[in-house]
């Protein structure tokens, strides 16, 4: 599939998952509430999907946004989520292996792409990176954020991983990386192509061969205690 699987497909996936979770609450006559954990890179599309979904449903969808690693940890510790949209495949699989997520519900809902962004207009972010023409470089934490791991792989592929260690600004998730660049606290930053930058600044669409494909899976959480609340 292309950069992002088409919006209609994403909506169908999200709507199906939301409907399934709603029925699992066992209370079709009253307004249900579904807690959804969403990786930071997918928050813009997800908000649009939820807005469309709620036009035809009494279900209230509550989004919790963060890095996939932090959301996974919250779920593992009993956080009351019914759905988890991760930015990778490993964390949903780990929840399935531990019995905390439904194997049959797992689906790849998106394939992410990485960009290098600067708020400078008419700039060449790739040249800025390679030549070192910047002060600070923002990326998400590679230990908890799949897009941070991908950014780290890009630097490794370009032979720059060790060169700019003292210029890195680490965000806990891709949303924080975006804010570092937008606010001017970083000259360059690795962001997701799904994040809405409009016409602000300049970006380099990073070739996919420089990092592993960012396949993103969603799963239903098997937490009966929370689902009955």
Regions found by a protein language model. Name each.
Residues 10-22:
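Bacterial N-terminal signal peptides
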Residues 1-11:
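Bacterial N-terminal signal peptides that target proteins for export
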Residues 104:
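Active-site acidic carboxylates
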Residues 4, 20-56, 62-65, 69, ...:
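Exported/periplasmic ABC-transporter solute-binding proteins
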């Amino acid at each position: 599939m292309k950069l992002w699987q088409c919006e209609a497909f994403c909506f169908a996936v999200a709507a199906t998952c939301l409907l399934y979770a709603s029925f699992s609450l066992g209370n079709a006559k009253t307004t249900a509430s579904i807690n959804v954990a969403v990786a930071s890179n997918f928050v813009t599309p997800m908000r649009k999907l939820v807005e469309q979904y709620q036009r035809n449903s009494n279900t209230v969808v509550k989004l919790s946004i963060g890095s996939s690693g932090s959301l996974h940890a919250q779920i593992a510790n009993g956080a009351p989520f019914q759905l988890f949209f991760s930015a990778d495949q490993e964390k949903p699989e780990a929840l399935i292996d531990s019995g905390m997520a439904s194997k049959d519900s797992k689906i790849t809902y998106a394939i992410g792409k990485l960009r290098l962004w600067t708020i400078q207009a008419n700039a060449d972010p790739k040249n800025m990176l390679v030549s070192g023409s910047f002060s600070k470089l923002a990326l998400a934490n590679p230990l908890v954020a799949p897009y941070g791991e991908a950014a780290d792989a890009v630097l490794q592929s370009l032979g720059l991983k060790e060169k700019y260690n003292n210029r890195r600004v680490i965000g806990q998730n891709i949303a924080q990386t975006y804010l570092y660049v937008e606010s001017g606290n970083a000259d360059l930053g690795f962001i997701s192509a799904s994040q809405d930058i409009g016409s602000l600044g300049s970006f380099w669409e990073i070739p996919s061969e420089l990092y592993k494909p960012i396949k993103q899976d969603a799963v239903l959480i098997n937490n009966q205690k929370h689902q009955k609340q």
